[in-house]
């Protein structure tokens, strides 16, 4: 299909999507409970959406179009509480986190939908290994061209988003040494990575048509980029975050992205350029591997500092934007997280060290999500 026209949306509105783990309460392994949970939730009144995902051991919740941090927090909290109430009668545990600590990918089932079955046929075992859990944030853009400016400008801050949300240190029972191992699964897909450096919608449309004519892609859904335009919504979609362990942290990160977007669109502190991507992969790796302790190389100044320090360095510039958006609490939470460097990956490792069993780690992660 041809590329859709870029739909009008209200600038700086946002939406949040969270992919969640469903586990049984016996051994806390992933379990295919999404159909049962969705049946139990049928008719429940809430904003946003609750829907199945690529595996029936996963479920996605998403807000509606939000203007404020508090609105997103209220919507996600309501859906969380509804799901917790329904899950108790079904003996289901629900958890955040970018990976399940000890699930075996070969045990996974692919959901019975045409798109997911197509992905399974095309990518083979990679589809089952894609049972990982991410947070996506959509940001409304004033125009198609502005969406591409914002996509590339905010790309400098991808290491911030990865490090702040990192919650996937374990894969198949092994401590990977990474703060966010989830993104290694995404990197296996051929259309992953970063979007091409194009700053006009006409140029992007021409690129899309060339790619479509090769037969490699059919729609924007076939691009697994870290940040991609979503013309049907009039947004860009930031896709690099693990699902945090709490609704509150997910909303803090979404609000941080919103205030960064406002800063970049209104203040124009720099113009994106191709050379911004010289250190993109290095910075992204540092965030995945070391989280907030990772190194950030500035693409123009060529200076090096911890990612946590780079986050703190931008926080002062974001104050007027956080005030305008009603997100001062979120900014304070982000600042505290960067100062203390006590992210979700660190929490999981500490619980695992104390509990000495990953089943107990998952149980406590379920309790943390429900709190």
UniProtKB/Swiss-Prot annotation:
Pfam family, any one:
GCS2
Q: Which HAMAP family match?
A: Glu_cys_ligase_2
Chemical reaction(s) catalysed = L-cysteine + L-glutamate + ATP = gamma-L-glutamyl-L-cysteine + ADP + phosphate + H(+)
Name used for this protein in its record: Putative glutamate--cysteine ligase 2
* Keywords, sorted A to Z: ATP-binding, Ligase, Nucleotide-binding
Role of this protein: ATP-dependent carboxylate-amine ligase which exhibits weak glutamate--cysteine ligase activity.
* Single biological process term from Gene Ontology: modified amino acid biosynthetic process
Keyword Phosphoprotein set for record: no
Q: Which GO terms describe its molecular function?
A: ATP binding; glutamate-cysteine ligase activity
Q: Which InterPro entries match?
A: GCL_type2/YbdK_subfam, GCS2, Gln_synth/guanido_kin_cat_dom, YbdK
User: What's the EC number here?
Assistant: 6.3.2.2
Family assignment from sequence similarity: Belongs to the glutamate--cysteine ligase type 2 family. YbdK subfamily.
> Which enzyme type, at the first EC level?
ligase
């Amino acid at each position: 299909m041809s590329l859709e026209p870029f739909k009008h949306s209200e600038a700086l509105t946002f939406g949040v999507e969270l992919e969640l783990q469903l586990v049984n309460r016996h051994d806390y392994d992933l379990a295919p409970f999404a159909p049962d949970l969705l049946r139990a939730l049928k008719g429940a009144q809430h904003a946003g959406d609750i829907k199945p995902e690529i595996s029936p051991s996963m479920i996605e919740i998403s807000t509606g179009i939000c203007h404020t941090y508090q609105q997103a927090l209220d919507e996600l909290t309501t859906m969380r509480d509804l799901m917790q109430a329904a899950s108790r009668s079904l003996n289901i545990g629900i958890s955040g986190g970018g990976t399940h600590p000890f699930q075996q990918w070969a045990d996974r089932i692919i959901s019975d939908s045409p798109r997911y079955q197509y992905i399974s046929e095309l990518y083979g075992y990679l589809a089952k290994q894609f049972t990982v859990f991410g947070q996506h944030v959509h940001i409304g853009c004033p125009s198609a061209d502005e969406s591409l400016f914002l996509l590339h400008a905010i790309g400098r801050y991808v290491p911030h988003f990865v490090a702040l949300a990192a919650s996937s240190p374990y894969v198949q029972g092994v401590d990977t040494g990474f703060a966010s191992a989830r993104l290694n699964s995404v990197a296996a897909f051929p259309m992953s990575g970063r979007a091409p450096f194009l700053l006009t919608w006409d140029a992007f449309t021409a690129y899309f048509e060339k790619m479509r004519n090769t037969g490699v892609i059919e729609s924007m859904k076939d691009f697994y980029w870290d940040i991609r335009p979503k013309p049907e919504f009039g947004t860009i979609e930031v896709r690099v975050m693990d699902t945090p362990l709490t609704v509150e942290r997910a909303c803090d990160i979404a609000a941080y992205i919103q205030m960064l977007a406002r800063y970049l669109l209104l203040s124009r502190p720099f113009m994106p350029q191709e050379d911004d991507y010289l250190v993109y992969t290095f910075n992204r790796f540092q965030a995945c591997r070391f989280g907030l302790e990772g190194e950030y190389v500035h693409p123009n100044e060529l200076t090096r500092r911890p990612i946590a320090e780079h986050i703190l360095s931008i926080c002062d510039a974001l104050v007027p934007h956080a005030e305008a958006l009603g997100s001062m609490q979120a900014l304070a939470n982000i600042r505290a997280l960067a100062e203390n460097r006590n992210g979700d990956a660190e929490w999981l490792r500490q619980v695992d060290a104390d509990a000495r069993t990953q089943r107990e780690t998952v149980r406590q992660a379920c309790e943390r999500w429900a709190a």
